[in-house]
Amino acid sequence: MTSTLRTVSRNFLSHIRDVIKTKRTRDRERVFVLEGTKPIVELLQSAPNQLVCIVVSPGFFERQPPEIKDLLLSSGCTVYSCPDETLAQLSHLDTSSGALAIVHQPTWDQSAILAQPRVFGLYGDMLQDPANIGTIIRTAAGLNVSALWMAPHSVDVFNPKVVRATAGSLFQLPIFSQTSIESLLSLGCTIMAADVETSADTVPIRSIQTIPARTIVAIGSESRGLSEAVLNAATLRFTIPLKPGVESLNAATAAAIALFHLSGLPTETAQS
């Protein structure tokens, strides 16, 4: 099926702005905006049904290899043409690539994930920095984490700044929002908390030799750390030792170190 290039209307441009700016619109319609030629092309190749429509600048196809133009126009997805200046105003990129897409939010089955014999997940506790969260999603996807659960009052993972920082990883990692730590405990998960404070209740991460079969690693924000509710729910609290005088790591860096180390450990059931 071949797509035709349509001129975008003012009403539809207004709708795109709403999707970009408001979580309420994204939640109601279960969509978000994806920017950049590379992530759009990758999504067309892997999951074309996720795309609602594509918006390009008038000269976009002239700058692309023939195979990219053919892929977009043969996708069956509605393709709109939008003036360069308007598209640049919509874009969250420093330099607009000349293409953005409205995309269906992915849906995941939490029960299927938790039914696996080994669960290695991540819990983000009230994380607010979009770039940090995007990097965490990208890292977790790369390290084959089972899923990411986000606490209430965390930033929306479909915020354009988060989406940009994920570098296309949003469709590779199951994500569940508005999740309390108590709900994960009730599902039989063990919480391992990354604590910013060294105390008698913490151990250095290098001392951990095994992990439970159903482990959730909890990461808090750099400024506040983990909430008391999460710390109290944790079976184990660990620290990432740093050189004296060095400030605490940001959430994305702490998550990367913790996930890399812990994901390579055997499970306790495997050694019993």
What residues fall within each predicted segment?
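Boundary-proximal intrinsically disordered activation/regulatory segments immediately upstream
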Residues: 1-68, 154-156
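RNA substrate-binding interface of SAM-dependent RNA methyltransferases
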Residues: 74, 85, 106-201
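Structured adenosyl-cofactor binding patch, chiefly the S-adenosyl-L-methionine
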Residues: 99-101, 139-143, 152-171, 228-272
